Amino acid sequence: THYCPIEESMNSINDFVLGAPVYLTGKVYNYSENTFMPATENDSTDCICSVKTNGKWNEFVGICVKIDEANKCITFATHGDYLVRVTDTSCYGIGDEVFIDAGELKTLTGQTAITSKIRRTTVGIITAKISDTMLAVFKS
């Protein structure tokens, strides 16, 4: 998982939803001594993008898994085991591989051509239905 700041000029911390996609803002920060500072060319590690709640497919970076309201930061997952929020889990099956398209979770089929867009927006394989609106997924 990745802990990162949000851009308050784009979103309030209250706009972020657990299990929802997050997107790149185009800004990168260096995390040092519990503080995010804009990254410079002298920074080589611990640089992380800030995130927003909406974006284009090529800005998709992960799924929000934790919200830190006090520090106006979130944690997002790019792989591993995590939960994804949907409007109705009955539309999905265990073992389905899913990706984000226009902010919605969609299912890959055996005939889906794996484009750069599909590869970059793949969320993972559904491992369980936690509730009517929450899926468990795994991505290696």
Predicted segment positions?
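Extracellular receptor-binding modules and their adjoining Ser/Thr/Gly/Asp/Asn-rich linkers
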Residues: 1-140
